[in-house]
């Protein structure tokens, strides 16, 4: 190293300061992961160099023996980890080591609770990478030179993990990055050969590159009498397998190896929920190793967030986040795909239109769905934990993936009137198996919450007849059902939309009685239409209600309350539509309504109409008018008493 130049002291981005503080306290019990994170970063840097050197071989600078080296000094209490990978320029150091260039960082930090165990999992999912060094070190130094830059354009970065860091230009002959950790006094146990070797074996055994350490108990050899022993040049040896895990036969891989490899590629602290490792030969030749995480990441609902698999071609790393191999509704899946068919100079644009990629995408999608189907069949409890984490994302599937619509539908779970809580545990196959004799439709209702759904007046006739209704209370559900028309040959029907047809569950006498009641109520229906004429499409006698006086029903193809709210929140224009007002002639309030005249009839009509709106989960357009009319009626009632 030569004399440093252009030394600057810069402040960390506010989010980095907050993350460092939280991480050091939340991850203390899992502190040994710092080595896994740093080795993973070094492995990524080697991958990137190898990829960029495909088109620019001089980046190797005459050294294509790619490796990670790990050294320690127990007296100085330091650990040094170096790689001869792509390295960083000065600007890259400031960006990568001084800021968090991730969307949603502020939102993520706001989700942290202060609970050490919970925050540890969340921070692990977010990906702490380099900053994990500060769990065990009170000072960290980084020396780095980007491949292709001159030796005197290297950078020295230093920080104690508090509010700022220093950066200066130095000379570094070899490309790549060297990180020096100055261990805290209480963490000096890590400056130990056996400890470091065991951590590399535990966490980084199956990364694609060797992690080397100095051979222990080196035989220095005998020296001539009277001469001092010469200090031998250190010999290094690989302390990991350095074989890409997915290239090994499945019967040679332990579950623990699969779990640690997942943590390496996903930067997750938790074990995966399940995985599938497959080799495909024939028309296409590729290997895939796919993982389903145990917990949803913090940015699951950000559809623009980086996603996808790590892509390798003939064992050469090509890119992270290759989203072309799985559909968006499976964006939670992590893993590796290694193809022998694609060209090494492939780009994201080429992947977009490659027929081999389309075939692989189709096969990998089927692989994930089959993996989930098997889990659902073999371990209902474990599958339920998957659904609780990722179910709402899987509900995007029927709209995106017509070919696999039925398979996705079988994986779905819903709440229903068959149960007493809001847990989504009922499959469509469960529902069909419990259908009443003569029932030919799958009935459902969408609502803002489970409680609102099960208390909806639209359910009354179904309760009376013992017909199960699915209660859909996720925001996505109404949109989902616009793309899911039938299951197992049975059509879906939203019980709050259109005409209600219970099919053969109703006998002929009931239908004839309903027609008779409708005729008798015609005078009242006409009077109601006159009052509500600008606000309703129709007024009719209900077939749904047994206990409530009235309800609102939207047209069979109109947008429901749930979907209208989503569109309103997104600032989108809503299509004009008017509901149908249904009354229950047997209800005492409706009978009383039929006896009223003039202003009192109008007031009572509007009160019933607004109550039907509220019961259906809608907001009132004129809440003050409703309160005024209701108070007026209550006052009259109290005076009459």
Swiss-Prot record:
The cross-references to PROSITE patterns, in alphabetical order and at most eight, read: HSP90
Where found? Cytoplasm
**Region span, A:** 1-348
Give the GO molecular function terms: ATP binding; ATP hydrolysis activity; ATP-dependent protein folding chaperone; unfolded protein binding
Q: Any idea which UniProt keywords this protein has?
A: ATP-binding, Chaperone, Cytoplasm, Nucleotide-binding, Stress response
Q: Name one Pfam family in it.
A: HSP90
Alphabetized SMART domains for the sequence? HATPase_c
Note down the stretches annotated as region B: 349-565
InterPro entries according to UniProt: HATPase_C_sf, Heat_shock_protein_90_CS, HSP90_C, Hsp90_fam, Hsp90_N, Ribosomal_Su5_D2-typ_SF
Q: What cellular component terms from Gene Ontology apply here?
A: cytoplasm
Family to which this protein belongs: Belongs to the heat shock protein 90 family.
Q: What does this protein do?
A: Molecular chaperone. Has ATPase activity.
Q: What is this protein called?
A: Chaperone protein HtpG
What organism is recorded for this protein?
Hahella chejuensis (strain KCTC 2396)
Q: Identify the coding gene.
A: htpG
């Amino acid at each position: 190293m030569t004399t440093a130049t252009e030394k600057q002291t810069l402040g960390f981005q506010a989010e980095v300061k907050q993350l460092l503080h939280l991480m050091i306290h939340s991850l203390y019990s899992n502190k040994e992961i710092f080595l896994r994170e740093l080795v993973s970063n070094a492995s990524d840097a080697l991958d990137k160099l190898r990829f960029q050197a495909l088109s620019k071989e001089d980046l190797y600078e005459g050294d294509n023996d790619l490796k990670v080296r790990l050294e320690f000094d127990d007296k100085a209490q330091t650990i040094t980890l170096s790689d001869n990978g792509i390295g960083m320029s000065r600007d890259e150091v400031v960006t990568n080591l001084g800021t968090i260039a991730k969307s949603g960082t502020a939102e993520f930090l706001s989700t942290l609770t202060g609970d050490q165990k919970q925050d540890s999992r969340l921070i692990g999912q977010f990906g702490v990478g380099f900053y994990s060094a500060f769990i065990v070190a009170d000072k960290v130094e980084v020396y780095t030179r980007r491949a292709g830059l001159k030796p005197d354009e290297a950078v020295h970065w230093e920080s104690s993990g508090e509010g700022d860091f220093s950066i200066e230009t130095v000379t570094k002959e070899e490309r790549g990055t060297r990180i020096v950790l100055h261990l805290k006094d209480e963490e000096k146990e890590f400056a130990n050969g056996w400890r470091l070797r065991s951590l590399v074996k535990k966490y980084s055994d199956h990364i694609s590159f060797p992690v080397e350490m100095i051979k222990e108990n080196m035989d220095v050899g005998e020296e001539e009498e009277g001469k001092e022993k010469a200090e031998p040049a250190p010999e290094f040896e690989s302390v990991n397998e350095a074989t890409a895990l997915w290239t090994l036969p499945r019967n040679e891989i332990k579950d623990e190896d699969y779990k640690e490899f997942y943590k390496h590629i996903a930067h997750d602290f938790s074990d995966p929920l399940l995985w599938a490792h497959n080799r495909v030969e024939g028309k296409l030749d590729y290997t895939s190793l796919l993982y389903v995480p145990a917990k949803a990441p913090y940015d699951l609902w950000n559809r623009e967030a980086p996603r996808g698999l790590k892509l390798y071609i003939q064992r050469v790393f090509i890119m992270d986040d290759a989203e072309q191999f799985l559909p968006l509704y499976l964006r939670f899946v992590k893993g590796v795909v290694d193809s022998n068919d694609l060209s090494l100079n492939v780009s994201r644009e080429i992947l977009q239109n490659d027929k081999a990629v389309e075939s692989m995408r189709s096969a990998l999608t089927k692989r994930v769905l089959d993996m989930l189907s098997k889990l659902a069949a073999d371990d209902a409890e474990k599958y339920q934990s998957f659904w609780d984490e990722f179910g709402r994302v899987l509900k995007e599937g029927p709209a995106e993936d017509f070919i696999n619509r039925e398979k996705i539908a079988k994986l779905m779970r819903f709440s229903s009137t068959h149960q007493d809580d809001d847990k989504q545990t009922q499959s469509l196959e469960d529902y069909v198996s419990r259908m009443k004799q003569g029932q030919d439709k799958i009935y459902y209702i969408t609502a803002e919450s489970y409680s609102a759904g099960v208390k909806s007046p639209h359910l009354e006739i179904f309760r009376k007849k013992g017909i199960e209704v699915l209660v859909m209370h996720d925001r996505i559900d109404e949109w989902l059902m616009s793309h899911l028309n039938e299951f197992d040959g049975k059509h879906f029907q939203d019980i709050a939309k259109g005409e209600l047809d219970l099919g053969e569950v109703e006998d002929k006498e009931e239908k004839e009685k309903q027609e008779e009641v409708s005729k008798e109520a015609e005078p009242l229906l006409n009077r109601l239409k006159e009052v509500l004429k600008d606000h309703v499409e129709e007024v009719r006698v209900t077939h749904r209600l047994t206990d409530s006086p009235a309800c609102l029903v939207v047209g069979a193809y109109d947008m429901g309350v749930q979907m209208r709210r989503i569109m309103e929140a997104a600032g989108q224009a809503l299509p004009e539509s008017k509901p149908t007002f249904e009354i229950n002639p047997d209800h005492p309030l409706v009978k009383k309504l039929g006896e009223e005249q003039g202003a009192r009839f109008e007031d009572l009509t509007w009160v019933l109409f607004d109550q039907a709106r509220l019961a259906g989960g809608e907001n009132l357009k004129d809440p003050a008018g409703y309160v005024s009319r209701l108070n007026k009626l209550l006052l009259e009632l109290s005076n009459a008493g």
